[in-house]
From Swiss-Prot:
GO terms for cellular component: extracellular region. Keywords: Disulfide bond, Ion channel impairing toxin, Knottin, Secreted, Signal, Toxin. This is U3-theraphotoxin-Hhn1f. InterPro entries: Huwentoxin-1 (IPR011696), Huwentoxin_CS1 (IPR013140). The lineage of its organism: Eukaryota, Metazoa, Ecdysozoa, Arthropoda, Chelicerata. It comes from Cyriopagopus hainanus (Chinese bird spider). It holds the Pfam family Toxin_12. Its main location: secreted.
């Protein structure tokens, strides 16, 4: 009975150790692609999205007009999709 408990404990400890080692090596491997992708897709100031003259979906429409395909909700003052019940 004692040998079975000891073997179960050693098996559990071995699995935990294996998990920790695999996790550590995997986290090191994950850092490299992240760094590479961030350097490839670095965003310049020239490529940043310019602010629109219209408000998109679920944006406030108090000062800006809604973009085409959206209407300003009279209740919440958000740009929403037009629907038959919103007339």
């Amino acid at each position: 009975m004692v040998n079975m408990k000891a073997s179960m404990f050693l098996t559990s400890a071995g699995l935990v150790l294996l998990f920790v080692v695999c996790y550590a090596s995997e986290s090191e491997e994950k850092e490299f692609p992240k760094e590479m992708l961030s350097s490839i897709f670095a965003v310049d100031n020239d490529f940043k999205q310019e602010e629109r003259d219209c408000a998109g979906h679920m944006r406030e429409c108090k000062e800006k007009l809604c973009c085409s395909g959206y209407v300003c909700s009279s209740r919440w003052k958000w740009c929403v999709l037009p629907a038959p019940w919103r007339r």
